[in-house]
Design a protein with these regions (language model features):
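Second RecA-like catalytic domain
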Residues: 345-346, 351, 393, 401, ...
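P-loop NTPase motor module signature
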Residues: 3-539
Length: 719
């Protein structure tokens, strides 16, 4: 099936590619070629059995093109060049297969005891669902089991993770167990950091990286196996990937899919893939004593850092062992860490969240002579295993991406976690022996919480998904095989936003079969090629129209990452003074341009350590600054591929002090470009108050760190 759809002139029978009868009328034998042209092309097709599946597609298409060549001399030259390419492809596949290491398995992991059963089930089924408790070893051992099942030859083993930190950690662990250098037979790929090469057989990556590859490899021919790890997280990427694989598998019968989950209803996933077999693998969990210590007990309400310190005192009296604290976000984690360091000097206190540098993240997994307290987001729930943990303190909250149906704004509020998440958190202290988990909320509160976390697809803005699906001719989200369908209202809102951005031709949700590339405008197709949110992509394109493309890229990139400017609660005045040199009173947008200009110069002239110190002294987050600069370069590469002119605003250098001009004209083109992506986020001041009235009667205020906080203009545009 796969062969006939991919190679029009060939049928795939097992590992053999043979000519279809009547496929491509053979020309008369060329007397200068012993055996004639038909024999030559048959031999070329046979050689495709010894190249990778992805190379097979490209080379088979090339063979078809050469067969249509009527001039003998041109055909002979093309065949010679093709034979050279096949030679290269054969050697490349041979090198990768030769580099596959001998797999060994840690005997203490529960999954090792089920290795043979898993191997046979994966080999004999196209889809397998594995319900593996945290600590079972599923993330690190499944890729090796796939290798031992004979997979990972014609294509590689792709292993997706929902977070960059987990992709790096899992990849490094697999490489270590196989005694390999990361980036060889085992590699990882995350945004701005690719550690793979042509010998890589196991590729651990974020699900976003795999989805991005669909643009140039829609049939995922580069892969023999796709392992979708941590499916219980039900992120938008995971749900989209599972739906895409559901559609892909009938035309890729040689592709294997393994879906792993810790808490999700695995029967639902198995049913999604037409009754795929389910294998349950237990973890290494000991009994956990769960204690409820609400923050408002005993007639007083403690803030979170104080409640955490109280619980640390209780656990310290229980005996030795490291403590893992779950909090909601980066700022909350840093507040807890600072409070604990002040009052618990004997502990080594370490934060853990996705935006930490790789070096800082690795500190959590290294050895320490002191007792540790690790304060983490939900990244340590299932994605990562923090070693040495005997105790857990759970704040019971997490930041959840949520789209407001009323204001049409995507928010990141702090919300109570589900029962499944709370149980995952408490289970992290039962891997080495009996553990204790303290929950900083009431037991009645726990009982009232939902059993599972609501899938992201049911609580997020779908404009980006709708745009991607239309660009890849996947139809309407309402007809796509998602495990849980999106809210029709969210689909309508997403389509209306795309119409506002001039990305689609109609504000109405398209009927079946009409949500394809023809529904997109030229602007929509261009936005779809940019690796950012559609609103930000529209800003970039408007920057090109306004003659300030590079400034628009800088601004869009800054809005795509977390704001690098820090304003700690206890040091707000000092932070404001440090930020003053790059503040532009006219707008936060122009302030960002000043910051980029100042920081980019320092980044070129200072080494990494010096630049980090320069950022810290100015209340700038060095890691976020680096991510901002990396995103700028990624967008510059994208617009160059699109053939856009790398234009600069004529006022840009002037506004930075290199000349003189009418200040009233500075930045108008830049502001117009930003407005193109933020049309529905304009606000009018309500009387002389601090409030602004936006679309759909949404009311909001300017945050104190904004340059507009003091001036309070009559109209503002909020990004």
């Amino acid at each position: 099936v796969g062969g006939s759809s991919l190679y029009p002139d060939a049928v795939n029978k097992g590992d053999q590619t043979v000519e279809k009868k009547g496929a491509g009328r053979a020309r008369r034998p060329d007397k200068k070629r012993p055996g004639g042209d038909a024999d030559v092309f048959t031999a070329l097709h046979k050689r495709l059995n010894s190249v990778s599946r992805l190379d097979q597609r490209h080379l088979a298409r090339r063979i078809k093109g050469i067969r249509k060549t009527t001039q003998a001399d041109l055909q002979a030259k093309a065949i010679s060049e093709l034979e050279t390419k096949i030679d290269k492809a054969e050697k490349q596949l041979a090198r990768r297969i030769a580099a596959i290491p001998v797999c060994t398995y840690p005997p203490e992991l529960p999954i090792t005891q089920r290795r043979q059963e898993l191997l046979e089930t994966i080999r004999n089924n196209q889809v397998v669902v594995i319900a593996g408790e945290t600590g079972s070893g599923k993330s690190t051992q499944l890729p090796k089991i796939c290798l031992d099942a004979g997979l990972g030859r014609k294509g590689i083993i792709g292993h997706t993770q929902p977070r960059r930190i987990a992709a790096r950690s899992v990849g490094a662990r697999i490489a270590e167990e196989l005694d390999q250098q990361i980036g060889g037979a085992v590699g990882y790929s995350v945004r701005f950091d690719n550690k793979t090469n042509d010998k890589t057989s196991i590729k651990v990556m974020t699900d976003g990286i795999l989805l991005a590859e669909l643009a140039h490899d829609p049939d995922l021919l580069a892969y023999d196996v796709i392992i979708v790890d941590e499916a219980h997280e039900r992120t938008l990427n995971i749900d989209f990937l599972l739906g895409y694989l559901h559609r892909l598998l009938p035309r890729r019968p040689d592709l294997h899919v393994v879906v792993t989950s810790a808490t999700i209803d695995t029967a639902k996933i198995a049913a999604h893939f037409e009754g795929a077999p389910i294998i349950e693998v237990s973890g290494r969990n000991f009994p956990v004593d769960i204690r409820y210590r609400p923050r408002d007990a005993e007639g007083e309400t403690l803030d979170v850092p104080a409640a955490v310190r109280r619980s640390i005192g209780e656990l310290t009296r229980e005996g030795p062992g490291d403590i893992l604290v779950f909090s909601s976000g980066e700022r909350e984690i840093n507040e807890i860490c600072e409070a604990v360091r002040r009052h618990e000097p004997d502990f080594e206190v370490l934060p853990l969240y996705a935006r930490l540098s790789s070096k800082e993240q690795q500190r959590v997994f290294g050895e320490s002579k002191r007792r540790r307290i690790v304060v983490s987001t939900n990244v340590a729930e299932t994605s990562l295993t923090v070693p040495g943990v005997r105790y857990v303190i759970d704040v019971g909250e997490a930041r959840m991406s949520r789209f407001s149906q009323r204001t049409k704004v995507q928010r990141l509020p702090i919300e109570p976690i589900s029962q499944a998440s709370a149980n995952q958190r408490s289970g992290r202290c039962g891997r080495l022996g009996p553990g204790i988990a303290i929950r900083l909320f009431e037991e009645e509160d726990f009982d009232a919480r939902p059993e599972f976390t609501e899938p992201e697809i049911q609580r997020t803005n779908l404009a980006s998904v709708i745009l991607t699906m239309a660009n890849q001719r996947l139809g309407s989200p309402l007809e796509f095989p998602f495990i849980d369908p999106p809210d029709p209202r969210a689909v309508t809102d997403g389509v209306r936003l795309l119409h506002e951005l001039r990305a689609v031709r109609s504000p109405a949700v398209p009927e079946a079969g009409n949500a394809g590339r023809d529904w997109l405008t030229d602007t929509g197709r261009s936005i779809a090629r940019l690796p950012i949110d559609p609103r930000l992509g529209r800003i970039v394109l408007a920057g090109d129209e306004e003659g300030c493309l590079f400034e628009a890229i800088i601004i869009a990139a800054s809005l795509a990452v977390q704001d690098p400017r820090e304003r700690p609660r206890e040091k707000q005045k000092a932070a404001d003074e440090a930020h003053a040199p790059f503040v532009d009173d006219r707008s936060d947008v122009l302030t960002l341009l000043h910051l980029w200009h100042l920081a980019s110069g320092k980044r070129r002239s200072l080494n990494r350590r010096q630049f980090t110190k320069w950022c810290r002294d100015r209340f700038l987050h060095a890691q976020r600054m680096s991510e901002w600069f990396d995103t700028i370069e990624q967008l510059r590469s994208a617009v160059e591929e699109m053939g856009l002119a790398n234009t600069y605003s004529s006022d840009f250098d002037v506004s930075l002090g290199s000349g003189s001009a009418d200040p009233s004209n500075w930045g108008d083109d830049i502001h117009r470009a930003v407005l193109a992506g933020m049309l529905s986020q304009v606000g009018m001041r309500v009387g002389r108050s601090h409030e602004y009235l936006g679309p759909r009667n949404a009311r909001f205020a300017i945050q104190p760190g904004s340059t507009a906080f003091e001036t309070k203009p009559d109209w503002i545009m909020a990004a």
